Structures are given as structure tokens and as C-alpha cells.
Amino acid sequence: MLKIIIIWFWRRKLSISLFTSGILLVGLWSWAYLETSQKYPQSYKSINSISKAAEDSNQSYRNLFVLQKLISDANRVLSSHQNKVRSEKNNLLSSSTRTNVVSKDSAGSGIVVKEASAQTLSLVARRKKAPVVGESLFFEEERLRILENQQRAKNSAMEDIQMIDEEARTLTSEERQAQYEHELQRMGVPVIAGIGPETAKAPKERLVHLDLKGAPAKITFLKQLLLMLKSLGATGLLIEYEDMFPFEGSLANLSATNAYKKEELKDFLETCALHGFSIMPLVQTFGHLEYALKLEEFSTMREIPESPQSICPSQRRSMDFLEEVLRQIIVFHLQFVNESTTTLKMTHIHIGCDEVYRIAQCSLCRVKLKDQIFLDHVMAVAHFIRRHWQQLNVVIWDDMLRPMSLTKLQTSLIGNYVEPMIWVYTTDIYAFISPTLWEHYAQVFTTVWAASAFKGAWGESLMVPPLQRHLENNIRWLAVMNKEGGRFSKGFQGLILTGWQRYDHFAILCELLPAAIPSLITTLSTVSKGYFSINPKDNDLLKVVQCYFHPDSRRSGHPWIELHGNSHHSQLFSSCSYLGSQFYQFSLRLYDKLAEIQLYLHHVQDRSAWMSAYNLRHNFSSILVVEAKTEQTPLFLQELITLSKEAEQLLYHIYDGYTIAEFVEQHIYPTVVALQNNLANGATLSRARHWPRRPLPIAQALYDLHMLADTSNAIVHDTIH
């Protein structure tokens, strides 16, 4: 009997499984339909209610998706079963009911047709039928009803949103600004008084700074970058070559061994011309000349022998050297301006002159005042440029001018020779440029430039720039330019978005350019519009970001960009695709992994009672605990080695091998060494098999450093190594 029951269940396994699935799907559909009916609001009365309804219905959307997926899978199984039944039925009929069998009789007089037997037909009649009604699919009407309810709810919400938009048009300017600032707060975007759609005023010129010193990005990557910058509203580039320019003749040794070739730069500048960019080369002519003065052949021009930071302006050789540097760079760029086939614009040359820390210290310069030495040198360089290239305007950094009196600035006539570029990278511009200083500048210069930052300003060794801080810096500059621009007869020339690669020639790398792309595109799109647009359809940022999800806060109920807390982890940039996105997202993973390992090492070494420096000096610890403390170390080591190889692969198409190696050595290698030391320390402590009685010997170094009073007691000392 049991055997018969088992056979019966086995023959009807498909029917039973389909019947069970049907019962389950009916239950799921009924539950989901009730949930949907209860949670979908019929109308929305405000933006807040829309957001709340969207958040409440997120779970229902997920449930409906699962239900529709189950229905779809069941329909596929059912369709497959129907096709199989049809195929078996056709095969049976073709093999068992041959009414067309042809044979010759013995007389050869005709054809005999063999009829199907009654037994064969009864077998076909007894074959079980598919457990469906007709040829329709399971729950197709219910699935369509779910989709219809979803679309009805979306249409209702969009109609109410359109009604709210129409009502917003009747709001006052103050009310619209209040709504705008409220949405900025939800996004985590800094709210700056006076900046919004009603008062939008973009800077006339918007230049992006390319700092190439010591880390030359490949031209192929830079050409891709140009296309992105153009689409976001950039009008030009401030290019700082330093040792990456292909100098010639007496200056050949200034170029790094991995400097650009002239053909590469020509290709790049021609691409700049195609995009209609203006070019402003940045050539340091006073401070930050380490790349030249570090070399023995140019060391005699230093202001003081021990520091290559600043050049001595009192030596004639210094001026000859600077003139040749300027001549080679200016002539190289102007050849593209003079060619009729290009549209490269070059109207300004930046001569640096910031942070001149070594000034008036040599025997030749000490006889003059610092301010006078600075002004005289700047005027001499500017006069050389204006004498040879009258079409070029000279720009300098402003920080050395800030402490000077108004009288000194006016009597020097520096306003006739240069345009200052006022640089502040913090979130409080007026803390560095007071209203009084603005007034002084306005009485000396007819026009000025402003300089913000998108990277390289909040830490000399960061891996990823703090986007929110850089965005606030740029928005505050927009407010300052709107307020202070009227002081100058020609207003502000424009805003430069600086992106420093190193704090100076001897410093290690700041954030690499691909890791700073989110900061760059966010700040550039904002300054190009004059404010941060909260509407994703109107924000140019989304022109260059491709997402698998639709960044629309009205549909999801969540802001399409969120910069709260750790701004590095905005979903928009950690999930979407754009130029450099793979390395940016890798940097986030690397940052988190390094933080995890540092915390691990802190616990097993610094805060450990068994692997501390004391334990190591005295070789005194518990082997069992040491083994437990170091068991994760090999795993972490392997993870970092894997991340190093991944970094090399991701950066291969962006930088040369030297820059890649420097990044790995700077960010990953120190932690690898710390893990290796942890393993070595554990091995040393684990080799001990016998330990001394307490008290342990006192370290001799404590007496040598006079940290303890020496006593006459006979104490066995142990030397600290």
C-alpha cells in the first residue's frame, strides 16, 4: 500500500508542486494587495507628505517586486510544462495512430490503410491534463492589476507634485529661497545667505588648476578630463608644470626624467584649443623654486645656502635665470595662439610669488626692507613680460601683499603691472581677507581674481578630499564675489578652482586627481551656475555621472545627493559611473581597510597587555595569547597586497609607474610594514620557553636618560634596544 502511495505522489509531483505554488502565490498576492491599498495615499498635500509616503511605501515596492518575480517564475515553469505536454501528445499521436501506413498487397492492386486500435485511443484519452484553465497563465490578471495600481498611485503623486510646482510659482522670493535652503539642508549642502536661484551670478571666467609637479597624469586621461570640464562650464585652465615641462638648453636639467615630451603637450594644447579653453601658465618666480634651486648648478641663487625655497632677487644671475624660464614656457604656448587653425586663448601669465618664506636674509638683501624687496622683484618680472609680450597680463598670488599698508601699495604702482589672485581655501573667507583689506585692494587694483580649491587644501596627505568643505569654500566665494565685486572698477576677472598635487616640491602626494573628481565636478558645476541646483534635471553635475538608479528625490523621497556626515560616502559618487569613478570607489575601500587594520594594530600592540613595548623589551609574555593576537595578521597582509595590485591596475591608464609606486609606498606600504613587525614580534615572544622570576630587570635606559634616580642598590639592568 505504501509503495502504491509513493508511486502515486511521484507521478503527480508536478501537479502537486504547481498546486502548492498556486496556494502560496494567492496568499502572497492577497497580503501584498491589502498592504498596497492601505499604504498608497490617494493624494499628497505637501512635499513632506510626499517624502513620508514614499518612505512608507518602500517596503511595499519590494514586496510587490518579489511577488511579481514569483508570478513570472511560475508562469515560465507553467509555460514550459504546457509545451512539454503538447510535445508528448504530438509524439504519441504520430507513433500510435498511424492512419497513413502504406503497403502494397500481394496483387499490387492498391494501398492498405491501417486503422488505430481502440486500445491506443483509450491510452490517449486517459493521459492526465495540465492543471490550468484553458491556455492562460497563472494570476496574469492579478499581476496586471498590481501594475495598474502602481501606475495609478504614481500618476496621482505626479499630479500633486505638478500642482505644488504651480503653487510655488506664486510664492514670494523669500518663500522660494526658504524652500531652497530647506532642501539644501536635507542634502547636506552648505547653506550660504544670499546664494540661490534668485540671485545666481556665475563668475565670468572659471578656470581649473592642473598641478602637474611630480605626478604627471597621462595626456589621454587629461584629454578625457577636458571634455568633462567643458560640459560643466569651465572656460580655461591654470597649468602649473614645474619640473614636468620639457625645458631646453641651459635649463634642460630642470625637467624631471619623466617630464612631458613637447609632442605630448602639443597634442594636449591643441585639444584645449578645440574646446575653446583659455590657458594661463603658472610659473613660480620667487618662492617655491625648490625644483630648480635644489640642484647644485643653480644652488648659488638661493636666498640662504641651506634652503632652496626662495631665490635671491638681488643677484643678476637670478633674473637671467627667471627670464629664460618664462621665455621658454611663454613662447611654447603662444605658438598655438598665433596659429590660425586653432582658437587657443592666452591672455594671462601667472608668476606665483606666494609664501616667500626666505626673504631679505642674504648679505645683499638685508640692506633693504622685506616689502620693498618683494615689490621691486615682482615689478621687475612683470616689466620683463610686458616689454616682450604686451598682450599678456601678469597675475600674482596675493598673500604677500596682505600685511602691506595701503600707502606702500599705492606708491609702488604695482596696480599698473599685476592683477592679484586672492586665494582662501577655508570656509571663512573674511577671516583672511577683511573688509578693510578688500577696500585697500580696490584702491590699488582695478580688477582681481579669486581662488578656491577642490583638492589639496585640507591635509597634505589625504587620500580623498572632503567634498562638503570644498563645496562650502566655493559657495562662500560666490557670495564674497557678489558682495565685493562692485568695489573694483572692472570687477572680478573670474574664479580659479585650485587642485594642489603637493604642498611643495618636497612634500608627498595630496589626493590624486581621479580621487578628487567628485569634488571637482560638484564644485565646478556649482560655480558655473552661480549656485547649487537642487533639481536633478537642472544640475549639470548629472551630465557626467551615469547611475543605475534614477537620482530623483521626488520619486524616492530621499535627496538625490547626500553630503551629511562622512561626505566621501555619498551614494551618488560611490555607486555611479564617471571619469575616475573606479579609483575613487577603490580609495574609499582602501581607506576603510586601512582604518580597520590601524584599529586592529592599536588593540593588539598599543593597548595590549601581552604585546606591548614592555613585553618585547623583556621578552616576557603568554604564548597562547600572542598566537591569538596575531592570527588575523597574515589575512590583513594578503588583503593589502591584493589592494596594492588593484591600485596599480586602476592607475595604469592615468599615471606612470613612478606615481603609482609613490602612491602605494605612501598609503599602503607603511601598514604592510606594521603588520610584518607585528608578526615578527609575535614570533620573537613565542620562541621563549623559560621566563625569569619577578621582578623583571629595570631598563638601563631609564637611568641613562635620567628618568629614574640612580641608586646604590644592586640592580640588574636590561638595556633598551
For each feature predicted by the language model, list its residue ranges:
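Intrinsically disordered, low-complexity, serine/threonine- and charge-rich segments
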Residues: Q82-S87, S96, V102, V112, ...
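Short, low-complexity, Lys/Arg-enriched N-terminal segments of secretory-pathway carbohydrate enzymes
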Residues: M1-K13, Y44-Y61, L67-Q68, A74, ...
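Substrate-binding groove of N-acetylhexosamine-processing glycoside hydrolases
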Residues: K3, R12-L18, V113, L137-E142, ...
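N-terminal secretory targeting and juxtamembrane "stalk" segments of secreted and cell-surface proteins
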Residues: L64, L70, S106-S109, L144
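Proteolytic processing junctions in secreted/extracellular precursors
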Residues: A53, S72, R86, E115, ...
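Feature activates predominantly on carbohydrate-active enzymes
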Residues: A32-P41, L121-K154, M158-R387, V395
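Residues marking helix boundaries in flexible regions
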Residues: N48-S51, S72, L78, R86, ...
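N-terminal signal-anchor transmembrane helix specifying type II single-pass membrane topology
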Residues: L2-I47
